[in-house]
Amino acid sequence: MAVRRLNHAVLYIREVDRAVDFYTDTLQFVVAHHIPGRAAFLRASDTENDHDLGLFALGDEAAGPQPGNVGLYHLAWEVGTLGELAETGRRLQSRNALVGASDHLMSKSFYAKDPDGIEFEVMWRVPRADWPESGDMRPHPLDLDAAIAHWGADLATGAAAGSPT
């Protein structure tokens, strides 16, 4: 049997309460389980998972991520609409966490870093019928206003539209 999808991610972080505050504020995760000072398990609002993100605290002296080394580059969290992407971008900007924005033609994305410097992507999936034939994944500048003008702020795609993956 083949893998169907990623079920959850677990991150090592320095301090659990700071990370919980960040992820619940910016990405609107809810706390499913909390082990004070040690770990937390967060759930996306519309998931059927017990948790989608685990956070394990290592302490303030732990080294941060090292860009350019072998390992995980980033996780991509999917939102359902361009309106949700815009709102998430505003929350990330208000926390000075936003580090980039890209149009991958098949998705519209913001890139950010959490308080421990762990990079992640928040993306909206372009409707499959509008994907380019070439599969070009090179990043292009994101024009979110133009995307909203084209598809509207409330068009649900991906998991929000019932896609199993």
Predicted segment positions?
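Acetyl-CoA-dependent GNAT
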Residues: 57-60, 125
